[in-house]
Regions:
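N-terminal secretory signal peptides and thylakoid transit peptides that target proteins
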Residues: 1-18
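Eukaryotic intrinsically disordered, low-complexity regions
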Residues: 1-5, 24, 202
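Long, contiguous hydrophobic alpha-helical segments, chiefly transmembrane helices and signal peptides
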Residues: 7-11, 43, 55, 92
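General structural signal for secondary-structure boundaries
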Residues: 14-17, 23, 96-97
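C-terminal segment of N-terminal export signals and the immediately downstream linker at the start
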Residues: 22-50, 54-60
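Flexible, charged surface loops at secondary-structure boundaries
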Residues: 34-39, 82-88
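Long, low-hydrophobicity ectodomains and other hydrophilic envelope-associated domains
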Residues: 47-61, 65-76, 85-203
Length: 203
């Protein structure tokens, strides 16, 4: 049987595989006509990808602690998240490649947690970005504003993720197309995923 460390390192390689399926907040997110937000323990961003960094920067601005990685979650898992989850499940979020989410999702199962929101962000051949979004309806409504945000989609997705409701709610799927930020080379065209992993709420 593979060790936890070997499993985490496998997740780095999984980043290159095709994708199968898909803290406190500052007052500028709070409105009286919306449900409460789920507290996020920490968000994960990947320093290799500018859009992921923009996501992390916006989350920090919103008051959510952010942790930078470079494809490998081993250090984050061993020295931060695993000790915290052993005390009790807390929600995390991120904008990463497939590998880190693959590992974190499976590790979360041991703590009665699951992915409650996921959006795949993929560069199209015509220079635009396709956002395939699956999650709670309230987050879908905020995701619709991606079109207005245009090339600054990553910062807007941080605000969408920050609207994740704390309880089970109706979910739906949608696809949104936005302009690409800048011209990119092949290495920058890796599909990214924004996601939320949270405790399972029993009906």
């Amino acid at each position: 049987m593979a060790s936890r460390r070997e499993f985490l390192q496998f997740g780095i390689a999984a980043s290159a595989l095709p994708i199968a399926g898909t803290g406190g907040l500052s007052s500028d997110l709070l409105t009286s006509d919306e449900p409460a937000r789920m507290p996020l323990y920490k968000v994960v961003f990947d320093e290799r990808f500018p859009d992921s960094v923009a996501f992390g920067v916006e989350m920090k601005r919103l008051g959510v602690p952010a942790h930078g990685i470079r494809g490998d979650i081993t250090d984050f898992w061993l020295h931060d998240l695993d000790p915290r989850w052993k005390k009790g499940p807390v929600a995390i979020a991120g904008l990463t490649a497939h590998g880190p989410l693959f590992c974190l999702e499976r590790l979360s199962w041991d703590h009665q947690m699951r992915v409650v929101f996921c959006a795949e962000h993929r560069c199209l051949d015509d220079g635009r970005i396709e956002h395939a979004i699956s999650g709670p309806d309230i987050m879908q409504r905020h995701s619709a504003e991606l079109v207005a945000g245009g090339p600054n989609w990553a910062a807007h997705m941080a605000r969408v993720v920050a609207h994740c409701p704390p309880s089970r709610s109706e979910t739906s799927k949608t696809t949104i197309i936005t302009p690409l930020t800048t011209a990119t080379d092949e290495a920058d065209r890796v599909p990214l995923l924004s996601w939320v992993i949270a405790p399972v709420v029993k009906a």
